[in-house]
Amino acid sequence: MKAFLFAAAATLVITALSAPAFAGTPVTLRMDTTDADGRITLGDLFDGVSGPAANVVVAARMSATAVLEAGQVQMSARRAGYVWTNANGVRRIIVREGVDNGGVSSSAAPGAQLAGARLAGAPRANVEVLAYARSLSAGEIVQPQDLIWVKMAGAPADAPRDADAVIGLAAKRPLREGAPVGMKDVAAAQVIKSGDLITITYEDGGISLSLQGKAMAAAAAGDVFAVQNTLSKKIIQAVAVGPGAAAVGPQAQSLQARSQPLRFAAR
């Protein structure tokens, strides 16, 4: 009888030792978290999730982006048998409209599919990234309240280190809430539109002259643009000074030189 009990106990110990650990399978957060159908799944969020668990829905995306609490995502992964340690202390995960499971659409070129596969397997490192707190229309000026710092898996190559670098600049195209900020997204705000009637001034050594012209292109302060003299119809190059105003001559050269750092940073 004692021998039987000893054998049974040994069997239980061996079974317990051979059972998979409760911690589950480790996974890593994807560098670019996107989904295509509004159903955010574990497969959309993590590398290393496979089988039915990849289709477990964590949340729904009702707009262009969705913001998920990292703790809730972590619990969802654990319930499915996966562990995300979140060693970098991510607080929120931003999921944007894109493709499912971090891949590419079936219509994408083979080269794009290969690039997507390489990206999915790249090393991950979460960092603080400046993102848009709301969606902006093209031409809209970026205000301090339009920016927030969030944790993301990676930052754009042209990500600004300081919010002051983009505050006061204009969106070059529609920008989505939650998207990371890149300097290529913005440019100096346009002060002159194509077709505007403007005043062109020339100042040098106490001499001041002015004439009326028609802007042949849009321009931001400090930009060189073409202007047509409304009397002679000749085209000249001037530097935008402000709304409805441009300059030529030494004054224009000085204004252009001062604006160079700003325009370089906005590219």
UniProtKB/Swiss-Prot annotation:
Cite the source lineage.
Bacteria, Pseudomonadati, Pseudomonadota, Alphaproteobacteria, Caulobacterales
State what the entry records as the consequence of deleting this gene.
Cells synthesize a flagellar basal body, lacking the distal P and L rings.
Matching PANTHER family: FLAGELLA BASAL BODY P-RING FORMATION PROTEIN FLGA (PTHR36307:SF1)
Give the quaternary structure: FlaD is a subunit of the flagellar transenvelope basal body.
Q: Where in the cell is it found?
A: Periplasm; Bacterial flagellum basal body
Signal sequence coordinates: 1-29
Major localisation: periplasm
UniProt-listed GO biological process terms: bacterial-type flagellum assembly
Q: Look up the record and report any one GO term of the cellular component aspect.
A: periplasmic space
Which domain of life, per UniProt? Bacteria
Per its record, how is this protein called by name?
Answer: Distal basal body ring component protein
Q: What does this protein do?
A: FlaD might be the structural protein of the distal basal body ring P, or it is necessary for the assembly of the P ring.
Provenance organism: Caulobacter vibrioides (strain ATCC 19089 / CIP 103742 / CB 15) (Caulobacter crescentus)
What keywords are annotated for this sequence in UniProt? Bacterial flagellum, Periplasm, Signal
